[in-house]
Structure formats: C-alpha cells, structure tokens
Amino acid sequence: MFYQILSLLIWSSSFIAAKFAYTMLDAALMVQARLLISVFIVLPVCRRYLDKIPKNKWKPLLWLSFLNYVVVLMLQFIGLKYTSAASAETVIGLDPLLMVFIGHFFFRDKAEWYHWLCGLTAFAGVVIMIAGGHSGGNINFWGCLMIVAGSAVFCSITRPTQNLIADLGAPAYTSLSLAVSAVMCLPFSLLLAESYQINWSWSGGIALLYLGICCSWFGYWLWNKGMSRVPANLSGLLLTLEPVFGILMAVIVLDEYISTVSGLGMMIVVASAFAAVVLPKVLPKRPENGKAA
C-alpha cells in the first residue's frame, strides 16, 4: 500500500507540472516528450525482459500499454489544457467510484447501495463545480469530460493490468509498456497537436523532466509494484488521496482562483469518494445465506 500512496502523491502534482510545461509546448507533444524521457530510463532494462515475455502475452501487453499511456494520458492532459488544475484534480476524485461501478458492470464485483448514493452525490458535486466556474476559475465542461473519459479507461484496465503484472512481474511490465507506448503515441501526438512550436523555458523544461521521470516512470513503477500486493478495489479507494493534495497544490503553487460555488462542488466530490471508502468499514456486513454476519 505504501508504494501506491507514494505514487498518488507524485501523480497529484502532475497536473500542476503540466501547466508549467504547457508554456513551452503543446499538450499532445508534452505527452509524447514525457514518454520519450521515460524510455531513456527504462531502455537498458527492457533488453533483459524482451526474450522472457511469452508470445501470447505480447498482444495484451500492447493493448494495455496503448490504453494506459496513450489513451489515458492524451485524454487527461489535452482536457487539462482547457480547464484549471484544481477542477481536473477534483474530477480525478471520481476514480474510486468509477472503479467500483466498472467492477459492478463488467467484473462481477457488486456495488453496494452506498456506492450508488455516493456516485450520485459526486456527480451532483461535479455539476455544481462546473456551474461555479462561470463566476471565475477557468473551469471548462469539455475539459472535465475528457479527464473523466481518461479516468474511465484507466479504471477499466486496472484489473486486466493487475493480472498481467502477476504473470510478467512489475519491473518487466513497467519497462516494456513504457517503451512500446512511446512508439505507439507518436502518430497520435503529431495528429492531435495544435502547434509544433517549442518555446524553451527553464520552468517548462524542468516540469517536463519531472513529468517524464517521476510521473511517467517512477510513479507508474511504484503503482504497478503495489498492484501486485493490493486488491483492485483497494487500489481504487486509495485514489481518494490524489485530489486532496492536487487541489491544495493548485491553489498554493499555481495561485488558482476557486469560486465559492466551485469550492462547494469540489468538497462534495471529495467527500463522496471518501464516504465510499469509509462506509464499507463502518457498516455491518450483509448476512450471507440467511445467517447473521
């Protein structure tokens, strides 16, 4: 669990670092650049695992790498370009509930009544947050929607990724998935980039290195290492930590303005996700086969 908490602390700062990187280059190019930086780190390690991967594991490895790095990162960081870092971090707070609902519909992990209640409350919180953006704070509906879509993809592949990591090992999966994703990302970064101009700055360069080394490689390495020891549902519940730190950093580091209405919506979303974590621990377990729990 320690590895995943540390990775969430790193990821919570990724949107803040990305805002600095956007002053230097386009969002799609930024995603490509951070993956390329990660490749230089993992490339020496990749060689030792290439011949050890069974042939029947390459197809799921390629698909999960494409979804986890290319699709998720493109959706979230292009969406971030249109909305504030604080609102983006708040929307990321929906991840635990998305994890539960996706598990309910696709993986037979039944959601309880309080999950549905928390999900409805969190959705209302997002609506309030976006509505409050009209009073200031640069909160954009389409930007938030793209980030939610990226989160939905991430939560959908958590269980298959966990199974693949159990077969290959976290070091092999992390290094190889980063390497192949950098190649698969190239046509999409060129297609989706609105500008190919690069305006060098120290703040943008340092932010890009941080995104490539810490957020792309080290953060995923920690997360994948922790996934081999932590159930998928618990992994989803740990994600409630990310928006809390992210919102605080957005206000302190970026000096982002949050209107009263948007702040209320953010609090509702974070509180709903937190309630989804706490309620299973405090409520009595449902009786099985007619017997008392």
Regions found by a protein language model. Name each.
Residues 2-3, 29-44, 63, 114-124, ...:
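Hydrophobic alpha-helical transmembrane segments of multi-pass integral membrane proteins
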Residues 29-40, 77-110, 115, 150, ...:
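Specific alpha-helical transmembrane segments that line the substrate/conduction pathway
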Residues 31-33, 73, 88-94, 160-183, ...:
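Helix-helix packing/entry segments at the starts of transmembrane helices
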Residues 21, 30, 34, 79, ...:
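Hydrophobic/aromatic residues within transmembrane alpha-helices
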Residues 42, 102, 111-133, 151, ...:
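Hydrophobic transmembrane alpha-helices of multi-pass small-molecule transport proteins
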Residues 10, 14-15, 43-92, 128, ...:
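Specific transmembrane alpha-helical segments of multi-pass solute transporters/efflux pumps
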Residues 9-12, 16, 65-70, 74, ...:
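Hydrophobic/small/kink-forming positions within alpha-helical transmembrane segments
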Residues 1-29, 136-163, 183, 288-293:
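Glycine-/small-residue-enriched transmembrane alpha-helix faces in small-molecule transporters
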